[in-house]
Amino acid sequence: MPKRKDIQKIMVIGSGPIIIGQAAEFDYAGTQACLALKEEGYKVILVNSNPATIMTDKEIADKVYIEPLTLEFVNRIIRKERPDAILPTLGGQTGLNMAMALSKAGILDDLEIELLGTKLSAIDQAEDRDLFKQLMQELDQPIPESTIVKTVDEAVTFARDIGYPVIVRPAFTLGGTGGGICSSEEELCEITENGLKLSPVTQCLIERSIAGFKEIEYEVMRDSADNALVVCNMENFDPVGIHTGDSIVFAPTQTLSDIENQMLRDASLKIIRALKIEGGCNVQLALDPYSFKYYVIEVNPRVSRSSALASKATGYPIAKLAAKIAVGLTLDEMINPITGTTYAMFEPALDYVVAKIPRFPFDKFEHGERQLGTQMKATGEVMAIGRNLEESLLKACRSLEIGVCHNEMTSLSNISDEELVTKVIKAQDDRLFYLSEAIRRGYSIEELESLTKIDLFFLDKLLHIVEIEQELQMHVDHLESLKKAKRYGFSDQKIAEIWQKDESDIRAMRHSHSLYPVYKMVDTCAAEFDAKTPYFYSTYELENESVQSNKESILVLGSGPIRIGQGVEFDYATVHSVKAIQKAGYEAIIMNSNPETVSTDFSVSDKLYFEPLTFEDVMNVIDLEQPKGVIVQFGGQTAINLAQALSEAGVTILGTQVEDLDRAEDRDLFEKALKELGIPQPQGQTATNEEEALEAAKKIGFPVLVRPSYVLGGRAMEIVENKEDLIEYIRTAVKASPEHPILVDSYIFGKECEVDAISEGKSVLIPGIMEHIERAGVHSGDSMAVYPPQQLSKQIQETIAEYTKRLAIGLNCIGMMNVQFVIKNEQVYVIEVNPRASRTVPFLSKVTGIPMAQIATKLILGQTLKDLGYEDGLYPQSQLVHIKAPVFSFTKLAQVDSLLGPEMKSTGEVMGSDTSLEKALYKAFEANNSHLSEFGQIVFTIADDSKAEALSLARRFKAIGYQIMATQGTAAYFAEQGLSACLVGKIGDAANDIPTLVRHGHVQAIVNTVGIKRTADKDGQMIRSSAIEQGVPLFTALDTAKAMLTVLESRCFNIEAI
């Protein structure tokens, strides 16, 4: 069927900020979809609140709106643009929920706007637990016994009838939010109450638990002519009971017989046809390992995380084709872009194994609840491709960047057998490593299968890896053993460990016997047809399919999996760098391991290597491609950490040189450079042991800021107020980076701001200064940032620009640089310098219109700022005010304290832009879901050192009609100062303590600060947790509360009696 001519203008709804459960895969899907629709000649209007994405770049759509994804703002944009149709299926759960809201509000009918891709009825049938159950019964598809509840009592009654364990699944939520497995009535009451609150339709499904069944996923596509196909089938290593986003996944399925595969395939196609979905859809099924019995778990009637994985695993561009299907094209008339000859109707065939392992944030959140269940906790994921399961699994392990090069954690060798068995039974984020340790200790795979319900096939593969380790131990320097180990994915580093040699010795031995990896192409058709795509993975076989081109090439290193501190912003910079390399006439090669991102879309670069970002894997690609040089400054700390080893191996690092990277990272060298350049910094010293640290703190004076050197995202950074706390920090936290000393700095509580600069070593372009709303002490990634600055004098701004220029030239910066400053008593101090792209690059690029990563790349390749038409110094400011606000995922992470501090905790960001600060702030708060009522009750529970400042805020809240409530100490202080506050009870006073008031909806906001020492007491943490659980705005920094107050005051009228 030809594409539709009756629609011209299509609105695409993005997925908003990155949170756990909805990450960069939607940037990838949305970007593909917008470009596909433009390719077909439609006018595309995009709305999304996330500035860190490629999707929100001007050239991706005809018009891009970076506005809050709320009914209020989307409605305004629709009325302004009058699109003929809306495509909501590429914006994750956010997009679907927005489509439902627009429909319920009557806006779609009122303006005669059509929904493309998935009908509202299909969204309802797949997402509404009751309708889904009815549809499955009509189709004769088995689902676990279940009931829909609207109250906790209904849930309890059902569970008493069918027995425990049961699973709770709230309707219309994302990543299993609010759900869980319940083994007792107490757990059921707690989880159901929370689930009903989080479900926008106050509805939960309570179903019999089928934990222990195999979990299988089918990624299917259908068009308007009812053609349907399976793009990819995937099997979870972990059985049912763990969210698929938190499971290790293999594609294609590994343990199914042909009969089982056909049975589940038929079920999936039957379901997508019944739902009449036009586009992509994900079906999750549970299969009894001992019979042909199966259940349908759920259906996602949209592009999902699994579709991004399926796209990258097969090379089949699901989102691109889903967008074209939505406008009427059919699978049998679209060419598969990978082969360029076959049609999209061909089901992909795989002649390799793909492994996906989730990346969890528990290196950041040591106290987080690591137990995995039906609610997702991973922030990102890695993918690896190999010719056998062992190879793909081991490549994925070393892609995780958690300090392992193999499925082994050396620290586990010290734990007792008893603890080991407990960890194997309890599914936590690191269970793979405990399973492997158990096999090394001689536990049989049959024992492990009965404890974990993980299929024997997978456990046998782990056993095989251990057997190869043993073979290596017995045959040191044996060539055949080396060949075998390499064929099954062992790294040089692991082999070196076993043979007690250096990694370089193994590399030399391989080279002396011409043992190099070859690169195979991902071609969707198991080499049946010629493929046109330059998308490769390494393996140790005979035939190499990747040929070095005649053109000079440049290798760009990506940033690996998304984690807190290193998000999609670095992928944004990578993609822009590649564009600039191509424009300059070079071949651009990307190397990355993250299946969710735009950078690993094979159409972005001239060549894509889907490989771990380790020294060995990068060197193998360099040996083959012989690039002119490697660019490391866009891949976050991942790529920067490889620079030294690559440089020592004779590789040309383009841009800022390794010794200059070192000068910015190494404390003593940096201090020396600042002295030479005449730039002040907070007093500080380096310490390599406890004695030196105490000596330094004594000399500088408490409070001090302590942190390890060479870290990203404020990992293990703390503000310490006395000697005892400092000793405790050194003994517990410095594990973060053992080879490097710790830094002890004077802690200055002043205004923070940061600058991104671009230089070629002679002149420096400063696109803009971003002023932080929160004062020093809150990590820059968790602060709200304002551009242009609202409270910095012209003189301060000039000083900042001058220091930035001196730093860029003094540190021989070629490309990008980020500098953070703190200002106290009109004195500007430099806190830190990062000689690489930072997380603010996308935001600043969007608000200034300067394509920063592209310009930086052109400078790296030898052009000057003058050549590109830019002048030295600070770029003229924009007329609008722009706010970048952080977004957190605390609802997904039990036991992680939401108190903000020097360690980064946010997972994403949103942007608000308008003509005034108040309007921009309002948009930013709306976009990050901090919606505050115009009036109500606000609770203050404040540390002694900030009570005076909190008092003036409380007075202002009272003036606009809020009722002030406070805890005992705070209320007493307010009363002394003449402000009466309603006293709330101590934690445990069941009737009126804060958690109880919050639970019953009596509190509209909480302001809670702790002293500089920051030791969060149990009560404070309970208060903060209750706010997070119930979705009540929580402010742990007075500056954020002040910003919110500014918005409320600007929206209030003055009402006074005459």
Swiss-Prot record:
Cofactor note: Binds 4 Mg(2+) or Mn(2+) ions per subunit.
Catalytically driven reaction(s): hydrogencarbonate + L-glutamine + 2 ATP + H2O = carbamoyl phosphate + L-glutamate + 2 ADP + phosphate + 2 H(+)
Annotated Mn(2+) 3 binding sites: Q820, E832
Binding locations of Mn(2+) 4: E832, N834
Region of interest (Carbamoyl phosphate synthetic domain), ranges: 547-929
Region (Carboxyphosphate synthetic domain): 1-401
Binding site for Mg(2+) 2: E298, N300
Top-level taxon in the UniProt lineage: Bacteria
Keyword terms of this UniProt record: Amino-acid biosynthesis, Arginine biosynthesis, ATP-binding, Ligase, Magnesium, Manganese, Metal-binding, Nucleotide-binding, Pyrimidine biosynthesis, Repeat
InterPro entries (UniProt xref): ATP-grasp, ATP_grasp_subdomain_1, CarbamoylP_synth_lsu, CarbamoylP_synth_lsu_oligo, CarbamoylP_synth_lsu_oligo_sf, CbamoylP_synth_lsu-like_ATP-bd, CbamoylP_synth_lsu_CPSase_dom, MGS-like_dom
GO cellular component entries: cytoplasm
EC numbers, comma separated: 6.3.4.16, 6.3.5.5
Region span, Allosteric domain: 930-1058
UniProt binding sites for Mg(2+) 4: E832, N834
Cofactor(s) required, per the database record: Mg(2+); Mn(2+)
Keyword Ligase included in the entry's annotation: yes
All copies of domain MGS-like, residue ranges: 930-1058
Domain ATP-grasp: 133-327, 671-861
Binding of Mg(2+) 1, residues: Q284, E298
Binding annotation for Mn(2+) 1: Q284, E298
Quaternary structure (record): Composed of two chains; the small (or glutamine) chain promotes the hydrolysis of glutamine to ammonia, which is used by the large (or ammonia) chain to synthesize carbamoyl phosphate. Tetramer of heterodimers (alpha,beta)4.
Family: Belongs to the CarB family.
Stated name of the protein: Carbamoyl phosphate synthase large chain
Species name: Streptococcus pyogenes serotype M3 (strain SSI-1)
Gene: carB
